[in-house]
């Protein structure tokens, strides 16, 4: 029997830099994707968290048709049983204060059936659909962008385990050490703490590491590819990418330094769980610097791999790790999948499995 077509879902993806929204259905896919700057801390650093949260709710509420179903992918550390957002340094600054996002959306637009999931969770839901028939036991999606986080799913059960706080994979706030010429580089994370993975390996973190290295060795950096391009008017990201394309040694050393914490995390993950058949890297940093990004990560793992395994099976580690195209793990599609799965009540609750919040 042919299944009836689904009505389109309004989907939104709230990142630290951009807010995207569109209409989506399993039958028709994504419609036209609209983009606007996120109403967040990066754009309005002087605004309080409550004001930024209220602005976000107004923005989302204005994008949904009356009586519609909406799926929201949110770049925040969330309790996935309740939908409460604990914190998002890129969106709301270093403040950590619980914010009941579904309740705020329902209050603003009670006619809409809202489903809210973390943005990495949303991307992983889409990725899981894309690789479900590829024999993958467990898949981990790692996003490297304005922030850094990951999620892991067991595709055999569909479960995304969470801890007692409803969290999983907030790796951007794990401690990390970055070395340049053997000397530690200490930078501060957007959450306010020094020495986190995101403090050096996120988009803003890479810029901070570059600034520290330029102060340490101004003569070398003055004539480097990134500096000369920025002096000619390019932004840091474009200048860094172009310098990597040209084989600039300063840019290459910077990339080596800032990918080391990511490689350390992935090495540990595969040591602890060999059933991770796919670790997919995504996000603006990974996509913007590819193919240099995956090459740098793989180089770390070839030089310092897994004890014995990397000697006996040299490709086992690197063969599981790759940068995937944006269309393979799109949080907009994942938000739509979550909205359809939620139905009138959440599809998952309790039992250590992540909730798809629609209450």
Swiss-Prot record:
InterPro entries cross-referenced by the UniProt entry: ATPase_NBD, ROK
EC code(s) of this entry: 2.7.1.188
Enzyme class: transferase
Thylakoid keyword on record: no
Reaction catalyzed: 2-epi-5-epi-valiolone + ATP = 2-epi-5-epi-valiolone 7-phosphate + ADP + H(+)
Region (Disordered): 28-48
Molecular-function annotations in GO: kinase activity
Keywords recorded for this protein, A-Z: Kinase, Transferase
Origin superkingdom: Bacteria
Functional note: Catalyzes the conversion of 2-epi-5-epi-valiolone to 2-epi-5-epi-valiolone 7-phosphate. Involved in the biosynthesis of the acarviose moiety of the alpha-glucosidase inhibitor acarbose.
UniProt record similarity statement: Belongs to the ROK (NagC/XylR) family.
Stated name of the protein: 2-epi-5-epi-valiolone 7-kinase
Organism, as annotated: Actinoplanes sp. (strain ATCC 31044 / CBS 674.73 / SE50/110)
């Amino acid at each position: 029997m042919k299944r009836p077509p689904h009505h389109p879902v309004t989907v939104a993806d709230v990142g630290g830099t951009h807010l995207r929204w569109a209409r989506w259905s399993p039958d028709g896919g994504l419609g036209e994707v609209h983009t606007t700057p996120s109403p967040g801390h990066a754009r309005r650093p002087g605004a309080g968290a409550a004001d930024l949260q209220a602005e976000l709710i107004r923005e989302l509420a204005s994008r949904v048709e009356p009586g519609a179903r909406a799926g929201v992918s949110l770049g925040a550390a969330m309790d996935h049983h309740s939908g409460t957002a604990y914190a998002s340094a890129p969106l709301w600054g270093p403040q950590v204060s619980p914010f009941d996002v579904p309740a705020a959306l329902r209050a603003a637009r009670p006619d809409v059936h809202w489903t809210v999931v973390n943005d990495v969770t949303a991307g992983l839901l889409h990725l899981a659909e894309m690789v479900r028939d590829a024999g993958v036991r467990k898949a981990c999606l790692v996003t490297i962008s304005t922030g850094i986080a990951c999620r892991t799913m067991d595709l055999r059960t569909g479960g995304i385990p969470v801890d007692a706080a409803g969290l999983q994979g907030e790796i951007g706030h794990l401690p990390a050490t970055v070395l340049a010429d053997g000397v530690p580089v200490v930078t501060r994370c957007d959450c306010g703490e020094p020495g986190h993975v995101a403090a050096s390996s996120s988009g803003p973190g890479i810029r901070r590491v570059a600034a520290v290295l330029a102060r340490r060795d101004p003569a070398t950096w003055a004539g480097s590819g990134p500096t000369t391009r920025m002096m000619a008017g390019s932004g840091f990201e474009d200048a860094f990418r172009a310098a990597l394309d040209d084989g600039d040694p300063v840019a290459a050393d910077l990339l080596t330094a800032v990918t080391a914490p990511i490689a350390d995390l992935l090495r540990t993950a595969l040591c602890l769980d060999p059933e991770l058949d796919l670790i997919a890297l995504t996000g603006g940093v990974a996509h913007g610097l590819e193919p240099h990004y995956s090459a740098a990560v793989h180089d770390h793992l070839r030089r310092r791999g897994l004890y014995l395994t990397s000697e006996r099976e040299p490709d086992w580690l690197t063969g599981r790790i790759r940068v995937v195209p944006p269309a393979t793990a799109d949080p907009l599609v994942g938000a739509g999948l979550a909205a359809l799965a939620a139905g009138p009540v959440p599809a998952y609750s309790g039992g250590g499995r992540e909730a798809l919040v629609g209450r």
